[in-house]
């Protein structure tokens, strides 16, 4: 990673965690993206298609809007070299039934899966939701992502029956 790329990293002190994966240890840092950057835009472009073939990466202007939105938080997992290896979005909102959070777009780079990165991201999202006074956290996941579903269930998420509708505009 060049010096110019390193300048794109958050300025806060490094607080890396050691994750013990199935085959080795892996160091990551989880942080909230608060500024748009080329590094973040590249991560969206590289990782979102791994989540779904239908997803297209946001352009730099959209990344700026996403990061600036007061209703959403973007959590990032970075490897020791600064490379972003995982992303997660948390939407926070208030409705008459209480303050809630919705976790979406959880994706870990295929080359680094199985090392606890997804779990670390979700744990950080749950901690953020608690700090924000959230009473209930919802999470969406594609029906084909069975390994992810097992993780979410191990973490205390419960499947529930619902009819969810979507309409493209």
Each model region followed by its residue ranges:
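Conserved N-terminal entry element of GNAT/NAT acetyltransferase domains
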Residues: 10-38
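Conserved acetyl-CoA-binding loop-helix of GNAT-fold acetyltransferases
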Residues: 108, 114-127, 154
């Amino acid at each position: 990673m060049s010096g110019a790329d390193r300048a794109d990293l958050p300025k806060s002190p490094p607080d890396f965690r050691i994750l013990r994966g199935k085959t080795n240890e892996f160091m990551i840092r989880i942080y909230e993206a608060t500024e748009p950057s080329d590094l973040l835009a590249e991560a969206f472009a590289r990782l979102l298609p791994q989540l779904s073939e239908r997803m297209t990466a946001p352009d730099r202007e959209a990344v700026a809007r996403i990061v600036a939105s007061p209703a959403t938080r973007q959590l990032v997992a970075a490897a020791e070299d600064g490379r972003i290896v995982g992303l997660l979005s948390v939407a926070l909102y208030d409705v008459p039934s209480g303050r809630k959070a919705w976790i979406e777009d959880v994706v870990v780079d295929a080359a680094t899966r199985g090392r606890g990165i997804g779990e670390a991201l979700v744990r950080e999202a749950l901690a953020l939701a608690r700090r924000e006074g959230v009473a209930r956290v919802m999470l969406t996941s594609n029906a084909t992502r069975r390994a992810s579903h097992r993780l979410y269930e191990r973490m205390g998420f419960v499947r529930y029956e619902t009819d969810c509708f979507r309409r493209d505009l």
